[in-house]
Amino acid sequence: VQSAGYERLQSQVIPGYGSLARLSVALLAASAAASADGAEVLVAGCGTGAELLEATAQRPDWSLTALDPSAEMLQEAQRRLGGQGRLQWQQSTVEALVDAPGMAGRYAGALSVLVLQSLPDDGSKLAFLSALARCLKPGAQLVLVDLMQTSLPSLEGQLDAAWQGFQRASGLDASSQEGLHPIGLARLTSLVNAAGFGDPARVFQALGFEGFLLQRLS
């Protein structure tokens, strides 16, 4: 996805996208660890900066690490932020970041919005989640938002048709899940437990897009 027009495209594809960044930041800001003044927070897969803009607005005291493997996305995020906030920019993956000196156990919270769904379940999802857990202080939380497989197979056809209809009504030729790798709640629970988190607590859902709070175990 090109950075130009990325936010508009996401709002056409994802129900409730306009509220995702605001809700994600508000949830993390209400957590015990990240509520502390000057907390260090990781935005893993920051894209064009939606969560960064919300974080600098809601919590200007936070020290943010904006992480994305795409130089183009980071450049667009930097343009949108325009020098706001206390930010460190990193063109990298979370798996590489956590191995750098001083990164393990550094962060009081993390955000990962619409990232895990792009990783295949061939060890890549587990590696990503494990690296996030290692980046966090014990007891710190991760807000994870992702496209999920439905837990109600009898409604799968209706939900998919509704998603296609939502996109058409938003002025977009309906897209498919090609290139995405959604998993179900049972598989997500297994992966996050193996990575070092407790069970996921669902806090948001719009059709197949679901948001969870995950707490790093001590």
Regions found by a protein language model. Name each.
Residues 1-35:
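Conserved class I S-adenosyl-L-methionine
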Residues 40-44, 48-97:
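Class I SAM-dependent methyltransferase SAM/SAH-binding core
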Residues 96-104:
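Short conserved loop adjoining the S-adenosyl-L-methionine
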Residues 111:
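A conserved beta-strand element that flanks and buttresses the S-adenosyl-L-methionine
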Residues 114-118:
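Short catalytic micro-motifs in class I SAM-dependent methyltransferases
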Residues 126-138:
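A short glycine-rich, Lys/Arg-flanked "PGG" loop and its adjoining helix->strand segment in the class I
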Residues 145-195, 201:
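C-terminal alpha-helical "lid/dimerization" subdomain adjacent to the S-adenosyl-L-methionine
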Residues 195-218:
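Core SAM-dependent methyltransferase catalytic element
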